[in-house]
Amino acid sequence: MELLTGLISSLTRAYAGTWEGTSPGRPAGRTFTPAQQADREREVDLLMEKSLPRIDRFRGLEESERARYAGRAHTALGKLLMDGPDPRVDRFFDQCEATGKEFVRRAREFDPSLSGSDIHQALRNQWVFNSVEVFLGGSVSLRPGSLAYSLMYPYTDNWLDATGHTVGEREEFQESLRRCLEGESEPGDTGTFPRLVRMIEEEFPRAGHPAVYDALLAILRAQGRSLRLQEPLEAADERTLESFTIEKGGASVAVDGMLVRGRLTPAELNPIFGYGVVLQFIDDLQDMDEDAAAGHSTMFTRACAAGPVDENSVDGNRGTSLFDRE
């Protein structure tokens, strides 16, 4: 446990250093002209026009079917936005679509009360798991561990993110999850979280795969620390905010890696952790307006309060945008 904890702490510091040391200018690499951007926008508009006649039918579907169709729409959009046809990418998206259909069926089988948005939230992690599978040289699949871990998101994140819970209630909830992940729940416990943990145990028995459970406990700890971000932070807490964000994002995808292999070398964990950091940044960027309205502190809400997040300077002064972290 200490080894993985130390690795995650080290990677958190390393990626924080990378973030802080990144130039505030635009990154090197390919750029797109306004004409190329307009072409892509037209292709997206065409896809939307083709989809409009199906909206009424979509609204009449059961929630599980709606989640499945939303997954197919994301697959189609992903293919469209890739830079030209690539058989490998097309194959990956097609395999993810097939996996998504089975995921929706099994999620509904596990809990018929899950909403379409809950299933889609869980499905997003399943696709992250699939991308890690391919990165590690495997094939796209749906496994008991990936299904269970993905379904933990709507059951835990949504409860912890909801307003109205006291600090004591949140701590008690976190403690109950910790005990379950450490194997302290009763064998006959029919609660949702114990059932999900048992699904992971069926694929990865505790005796032979301690790293899997160490990783799950690591994301639980990171999740608990990140609850501080639901309160406004003082300017002096910028580094704390940065550290919590990076740790939570990296640790979440580290679990996916462990569920692919059962264990990872430090060299394998490094890029997978970094992948999780990037996904966390994207998530926080997408949720920026919602988080700001709720009073949650993220790197993006803080930057937004200081000025436009997509500009390198405001009124000629550096230090007022997300891309300047000095």
Regions found by a protein language model. Name each.
Residues 1-37:
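Intrinsically disordered, low-structural-confidence terminal and linker regions
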Residues 7-10, 14, 43, 47, ...:
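Charge-rich, solvent-exposed alpha-helical interaction surfaces
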Residues 10-25, 50-61, 79, 83, ...:
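Surface-exposed polar/charged interaction patches
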Residues 18-23, 42-48, 67-70, 163-172, ...:
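Short, compositionally biased low-complexity segments
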Residues 36-52, 143-151, 155:
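Amphipathic alpha-helical protein-interaction segments
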Residues 54-105:
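Low-complexity, highly charged intrinsically disordered N-terminal segments
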Residues 86-154, 158-174, 180-292:
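All-alpha helical catalytic cores of prenyl diphosphate-utilizing isoprenoid enzymes
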Residues 267-326:
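Active-site/pore-lining binding-face segments in mid-to-C-terminal subdomains
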